[in-house]
């Protein structure tokens, strides 16, 4: 262990099929983190000056470690399982930023300033369906932990494919924790950092700020 989490303020777990998605997506890395770094993780999230983000495979890891949704390290309260389509999906999807989200990563992305709270990002996964018991889903909704939802062309959350690429319950594409300092999402915002990276960038007009975070 050459480094210690106490020396850092941000833990970022990117996408990328850790350990080849053996067993299930994110499982092995999650087991390693909870087996060898549970104490460090607990101390890390207890600090007030830390942030954690997990994208795609990173979101799967955060779910399987128990960091999301309820910060219960070693306890899984939800899962990200096989897409309803039965195959890997790589496509652009439309998302709505939840206006009541407490996630600090979204602090400057208010509805009025960010294309009316609608964004487009790529998804690229085979196991992205957010699934949990009803009482867990109800708690997530009650505590405003949802950050992003898949939406249709009318801007409404949807369960229909392909707008919802995996069949996630309540069209959930991303969630945060009760502090708002941990964010996990299946879509890839890092693939859209310049407006020109969107396939319709010449046709679509965006408000100041743009989904590309320029």
For every predicted segment, state its role.
Residues 1, 5-21:
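N-terminal cofactor/phosphate-binding cores enriched in small/glycine residues
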Residues 12-14, 54-56, 122-124, 186:
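Short beta-strand segments
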Residues 2-3, 41-45, 75-214:
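Amide-donor transfer/coupling interface in amidating biosynthetic enzymes
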Residues 19-102:
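Cysteine-nucleophile active-site neighborhood
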């Amino acid at each position: 262990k050459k480094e210690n989490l106490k020396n850092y303020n941000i833990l970022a777990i990117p996408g990328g099929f850790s350990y080849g998605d053996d067993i299930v997506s994110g499982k092995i890395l999650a087991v390693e983190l909870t087996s060898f770094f549970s104490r460090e993780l607990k101390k890390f999230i207890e600090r007030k000056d830390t942030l954690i983000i997990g994208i795609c495979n990173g979101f799967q890891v955060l779910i399987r470690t128990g960091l999301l949704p309820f910060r219960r390290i070693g306890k899984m309260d939800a899962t990200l399982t096989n897409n309803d389509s039965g195959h890997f999906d790589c496509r652009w999807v439309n998302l709505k930023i939840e206006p009541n989200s407490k996630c600090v990563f979204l602090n400057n992305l208010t509805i009025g300033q960010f294309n009316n709270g609608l964004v487009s990002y790529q998804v690229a996964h085979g196991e992205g369906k957010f699934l949990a018991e009803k009482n867990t889903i109800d708690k997530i909704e009650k505590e405003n932990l949802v950050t992003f939802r898949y939406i249709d062309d009318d801007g409404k959350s949807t369960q229909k494919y392909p707008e919802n690429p995996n069949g996630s319950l309540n069209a959930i594409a991303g969630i945060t924790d009760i502090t708002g300092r941990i964010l996990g999402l299946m879509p890839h915002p890092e693939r859209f950092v310049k407006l020109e990276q969107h396939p319709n960038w010449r046709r679509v007009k965006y408000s100041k700020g743009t989904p590309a975070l320029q």
